[in-house]
């Protein structure tokens, strides 16, 4: 896909994967509408990129249905078209399902599942008017292989993956594509701030960079894939566990021990 003069909306666009994707889209010549709850970081990334392309910002909570509708009206008003929607905003509160606050559970469902469903639905007529376009949902390997201490998060990402696959079929032949990128742990700093609550199983997999996930987002815009897992080997492992669930009790302890070693090493490095 040629991004020159295309309009790209990125939720969660102020930092991490969202900011990395914004930089790559800007380098490719796309116009950007960046969305986040925090104005300070949003303004900072917008100012950084304005020498390269046109950038607008919209401060909002993606769980606000009225704001979601206003987002597309703003994009249409500012740029005259919408070509790509990246549903990247996310929320993750780790802990045992019995102890995680009900408000946090609800917010994970609202932000990680309900919001991208609503935003995708709202985007469709605008993408159709532009002659076609792309929706990229940022999922997680936890949506393919549920992770302890992240039960609700895993459920929200699994639901997002299922929605993506179903809508992909509904949109077949329409000129509008939807896909999901499913990364494992990402080196954005957030994972280290809550490391004691992160499952050992999570750290058994290679940690991706925000740039690697962002590049996968751009790649999915221009190919026929419905899903891209990062790292690829982790995606293969989750597929095997899904196809052969009887394997899980045998291999899981190995990966948990491996992850525990990695976690201890990371914590030691953080103390230095």
List the predicted regions and their residue ranges.
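Residue(s) in the substrate-gating loop at a strand-loop-helix junction
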Residues: 140
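SDR active-site lid
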Residues: 170-232
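Active-site helix of classical SDR
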Residues: 120, 156
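Conserved glycine-rich Rossmann-like NAD(P)H-binding loop of the short-chain dehydrogenase/reductase
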Residues: 28-45
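Substrate-binding pocket helix/loop in short-chain dehydrogenase/reductase
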Residues: 96-97, 101-109
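Conserved glycine-rich cofactor-binding loop
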Residues: 7, 14-16
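The beta1-alpha1 cofactor-binding region of Rossmann-like NAD(H)/NADP(H)-dependent oxidoreductases
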Residues: 40, 58-70, 102
């Amino acid at each position: 896909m040629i991004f020159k003069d295309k309009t790209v909306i990125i939720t969660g666009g102020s930092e991490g994967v969202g900011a990395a994707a914004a930089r790559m889209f800007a380098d490719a010549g796309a116009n950007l509408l960046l969305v986040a709850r925090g104005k300070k970081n949003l303004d900072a990334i917008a100012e950084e990129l304005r020498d390269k392309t046109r950038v607008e910002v919209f401060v909002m909570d993606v769980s606000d249905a009225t704001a979601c509708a206003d987002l597309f009206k703003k994009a249409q008003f500012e740029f005259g078209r919408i070509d790509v929607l990246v549903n990247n905003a996310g929320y993750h509160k780790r802990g045992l399902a019995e102890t995680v606050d009900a408000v946090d559970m609800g917010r994970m469902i609202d932000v990680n599942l309900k919001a991208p469903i609503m935003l995708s639905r709202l985007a469709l007529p605008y993408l159709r008017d532009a002659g076609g376009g792309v929706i990229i949902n940022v999922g997680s390997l936890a949506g393919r292989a549920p992770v302890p201490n992240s039960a609700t998060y895993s459920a929200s990402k699994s639901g997002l993956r299922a929605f993506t696959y179903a809508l992909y079929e509904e949109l077949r032949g329409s000129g509008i594509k939807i896909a999901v990128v499913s990364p494992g742990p990402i080196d954005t700093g957030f994972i280290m701030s809550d490391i004691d609550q992160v499952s050992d199983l999570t750290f058994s997999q290679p940690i991706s960079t925000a740039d690697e996930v962002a590049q996968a987002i751009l790649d999915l815009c221009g190919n026929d894939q419905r899903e891209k897992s990062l790292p690829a080997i982790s995606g293969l492992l989750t597929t095997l566990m899904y196809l052969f669930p009887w394997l899980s009790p045998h291999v899981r302890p190995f990966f948990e021990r491996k992850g525990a070693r990695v976690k201890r090493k990371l914590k030691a490095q953080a103390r230095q």
